[in-house]
């Protein structure tokens, strides 16, 4: 299949096709292991799992296609990033944070995602620094309630939280590195690492909740 794809995009397709497999595997695991959770938690998990598979599917498709449709899929790809960030927050805020700051954190990140959705419809490919600030701001939004994070997160969950956020943040360097043709594929690897770390974080939270 890869021989029909632009050679400059092959590694980009391959890395996030692995992400699709990862997302499906994580989804199967979560619903197999946590099927007895409350409906609220199962809905939150469904949103997270969908956002995970959606992100990697959109990215893989964007890098695989060519022609005019590529611009459409670029918009979908960027919107999927917003959706994954907010989707990752959803099971965290509706379980561990549910009786504290969960509602306002969840409302905040999904509100930013909604604004970002409109922004990306019209301005994908423009104002990239603003986009990165929006992504990173959403990602670290939880630290606005750092005290609750410190009090409620287990050691393992906290480690995976910071590890995942750090992977995404470090990956931005490669995303912005335009002079090295393989930099975007390396960015994809950092995204995979960040997504996997946050999947472990969510699992830890479900185990202690």
Give residue ranges: language-model regions.
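Multi-pass alpha-helical transmembrane bundles in non-GPCR membrane proteins
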Residues: 1-209
């Amino acid at each position: 299949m890869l021989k029909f794809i632009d050679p400059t995009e092959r590694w980009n397709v391959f890395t996030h096709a692995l992400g699709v497999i990862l997302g499906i595997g994580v989804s199967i695991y979560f619903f197999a292991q946590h099927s007895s959770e409350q409906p609220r938690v199962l809905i939150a998990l469904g949103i997270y799992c969908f956002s995970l598979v959606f992100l990697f599917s959109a990215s893989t498709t964007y890098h695989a296609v060519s022609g005019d449709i590529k611009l459409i899929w670029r918009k979908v790809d960027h919107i999927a990033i917003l959706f994954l960030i907010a989707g990752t927050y959803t099971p965290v805020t509706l379980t561990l944070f549910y009786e504290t700051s969960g509602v306002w954190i969840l409302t905040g990140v999904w509100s930013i995602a909604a604004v970002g959705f409109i922004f990306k419809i019209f301005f994908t490919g423009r104002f990239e620094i603003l986009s990165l600030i929006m992504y990173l701001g959403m990602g670290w939004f939880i630290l606005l309630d750092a005290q609750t994070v410190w009090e409620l997160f287990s050691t393992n969950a906290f480690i995976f939280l910071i590890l995942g956020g750090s992977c995404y943040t470090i990956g931005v360097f490669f995303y912005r590195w335009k002079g090295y043709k393989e930099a975007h594929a390396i960015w994809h690897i950092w995204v995979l690492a960040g997504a996997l770390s946050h999947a472990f974080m969510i699992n830890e939270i479900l185990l202690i909740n």
